[in-house]
Amino acid sequence: MASVFLIDLGNEAAEMIAGVFSIERHTVRRKPSRLDTRELRNAAMIFAGGGPKQYLPLLRQVRRELPRMPFVVVNDGADTRAWLEAIEAGATDYFCTPVARRQIQWLMQSIMPASTRGLDVRIPLGWSSAAAD
C-alpha cells in the first residue's frame, strides 16, 4: 500500500483524509511543514494546509525535487487568490474545508495508480433509469 503525508492540516480535515486512506490500508503520516523533502520521496500523495505561508514554499520545493508528486492544498474556506496561487505553483488540486469524503475518494481513484489502491468489490444491485439514458 501507499504512504500519504498530511502536512500542517487542521484536526478535522486530517481525520477525514486519514479515515479514507486508512480504510484502504494506506499509511498516513502527519508532519509539520518544516521537514526534509527526502522524507516525501516514497509518498504516494501529499496533503498540505496551514495557510499559504506554510504550504507554498513546500509546494515549490516539492515541484523542483519531485515534479510528479500529487500535492493537494487544503485551505480553510474558499479564497480565490490562495486557490490561484496554489494552482499556479503546481498544486494537483485545492480543497476547502470541510473536506467531503467523496472528494478524497475521487482524488484517490483518479491520481493514485490502481496497484496502490484496494480493489473495489462493490456489486451494483439496483437498476437506475439514469443509467439507461
Could you describe each region identified by the protein language model?
Residues 85-86:
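Residue preferences within the helical output face of two-component receiver
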Residues 115-133:
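CheY-like receiver
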Residues 7-31:
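Two-component/phosphorelay signaling modules centered on CheY-like receiver
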Residues 99-108:
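C-terminal output helix
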Residues 14, 34-66, 75-82:
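Conserved phosphotransfer microenvironments
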